[in-house]
Amino acid sequence: MSLVLISAVQTLLKRVEERTGKPIAAIEKSDLPMSAEIKITAKNETAHQLFYRKGYDEQINYIIANQCGHILRLFDAPADQRFMPIANYRTMMSYIMEMGAECHRFAHLFDPEKIKRMVRLWYEGVVFQLTKMPPDIMIDKWLYNEYPDLRSIQLKSLIRQRQAAVQSLTSDTRKFTPDKIYRVSNIMNYVFFKVLEDHFRLDWVAPYHGTIFIFDGSALATLTERNYINNHTGDRAMIDAWAQRLDLTTWFEWKKYET
């Protein structure tokens, strides 16, 4: 199955090729967890790889556009100022040492192997939100403003993301999630949708009214809107600001990106 994309996304891919100085090779891959993923070149590689899953739908356009946004922001920074957020053994151990006692309360509910999987999933989920959501806010604003042909697909994707976020407010999710994970994840969801709600002029955070997340979330949303510097350096600063506010500073590290 060949990859067919709308013209706006084709334009973005060309911008990535021009900005990075390397071509993008599209490769069908059946076992992808999402419909598309761009793997930027390692030091000695000659081309970026755009993996896509057979049977994709129109949402692939937004997924690829979003990833192009991340790459362009990274490469717009001077080479010696490009950094990638990473999780490693050290950051994972910091998380486990902090959360071990809280995770232990689930020992009577699940078998040890399932708890191990859940502990990793909780960690990966929060770090993904923390390191992706702040730049995603700026990328989504930019895509909405600059690529109107993508707008309807973008909004459908964000509505789907919002529905998943709202589902995490349920009592069942609360019951089977460590307190800190539940709290910081919902605060980050609130901030993301609050800032975009204001930009898109939509009502996206009504389900959070009456929850405890609106208090810390409102303060962090205000900080995000007022203080965000719209570039890669600003992305790093805002991710660090979120991490500081949410007490997640040891759960990830920055690594210099080498081309």
Question: What kind of feature is each model-predicted range?
Answer:
Residues 1-44, 56-57, 78, 125, ...:
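Auxiliary, metal-adjacent structural segments of Zn-dependent hydrolase domains
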Residues 73-124:
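Post-HEXXH active-site segment of zinc metalloproteases
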Residues 138-259:
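Pan-zinc metallopeptidase signature
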Residues 63, 67-75:
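Catalytic glutamate of the conserved HExxH
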Residues 126-139:
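Solvent-exposed aromatic/hydrophobic patches embedded in short alpha-helical segments
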Residues 59, 106-120, 181-195:
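Short, surface-exposed, charge-dense and proline/glycine-enriched linear segments
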Residues 6, 111-112, 136, 230-231:
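Helix N-terminus capping/helix-initiation residues
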Residues 48-64:
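Short pre-active-site segment immediately N-terminal to the catalytic Zn-binding motif
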